């Protein structure tokens, strides 16, 4: 007699849609909760090699908070690919120009690297204000 262990498959689970309001939330604490839900760690059937996480809509990204002096001292770096092409932008400037990217960068760093992490990241939708175009999915409000 063989006792088979349970192996989750991505298609066996219904993925829910949730909406999170980022107003007044701390960036790191919010990002860890988002990454955990994208991976599916809140579910009993969690399996590390299967994408069973839910879809998340984050609204009001422009109202995110950070602690300490990170608003002025935190920088985001990227390289253009040319010699001397290292660019940096301060957190406060990034918050005014691209508020969605702040949450996306924080969450992407907490997800697995590789194809599985990329598929998990595609389930995250971030918006600077409270308007989103996913009302057809009937997202549930998630308080974090």
Curated annotation (Swiss-Prot):
Does the record bear Ribonucleoprotein in its keywords? Answer: yes
Q: Output a single Gene Ontology CC term carried by this record.
A: cytosolic large ribosomal subunit
Using the record, list the residue span of the signal peptide; answer none if the entry has no such feature: none
> InterPro entries annotated for this entry?
Ribosomal_uL13, Ribosomal_uL13_bac-type, Ribosomal_uL13_CS, Ribosomal_uL13_sf
- Pfam families tied to this protein: Ribosomal_L13 (PF00572)
- One of this protein's GO BP terms? negative regulation of translation
Among SUPFAM superfamilies, the record links this protein to: Ribosomal protein L13
UniProt keywords, alphabetically: Ribonucleoprotein, Ribosomal protein
Q: Per the record's keyword annotation, is Ribonucleoprotein included, yes or no?
A: yes
Q: Which GO terms describe its molecular function?
A: mRNA binding; structural constituent of ribosome
Quaternary structure (record): Part of the 50S ribosomal subunit.
Per the record, the similarity remark reads: Belongs to the universal ribosomal protein uL13 family.
What NCBIfam families does the annotation carry? rplM_bact
Q: Write out the function statement from the record.
A: This protein is one of the early assembly proteins of the 50S ribosomal subunit, although it is not seen to bind rRNA by itself. It is important during the early stages of 50S assembly.
Q: Provide the protein name.
A: Large ribosomal subunit protein uL13
Q: Which organism is it from?
A: Buchnera aphidicola subsp. Baizongia pistaciae (strain Bp)
Biological classification of the source:
Bacteria, Pseudomonadati, Pseudomonadota, Gammaproteobacteria, Enterobacterales
């Amino acid at each position: 007699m063989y006792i088979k262990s349970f192996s989750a498959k991505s298609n066996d689970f219904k993925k829910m849609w949730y909406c999170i309001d980022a107003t007044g939330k701390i960036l790191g604490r919010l990002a860890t909760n988002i990454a955990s839900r994208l991976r599916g760690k809140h579910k009993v059937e969690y399996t590390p090699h299967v994408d069973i996480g839910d879809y998340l809509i984050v609204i009001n990204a422009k109202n995110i908070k950070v602690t300490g002096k990170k608003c002025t001292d935190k920088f985001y770096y990227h390289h253009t690919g040319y010699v001397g092409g290292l660019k940096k932008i301060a957190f406060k400037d990034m918050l005014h120009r691209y508020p969605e990217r702040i949450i996306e960068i924080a969450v992407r760093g907490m997800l697995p690297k590789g194809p599985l992490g990329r598929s998990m990241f595609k389930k995250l939708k971030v918006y600077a204000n409270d308007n989103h175009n996913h009302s057809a999915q009937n997202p549930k409000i998630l308080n974090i």
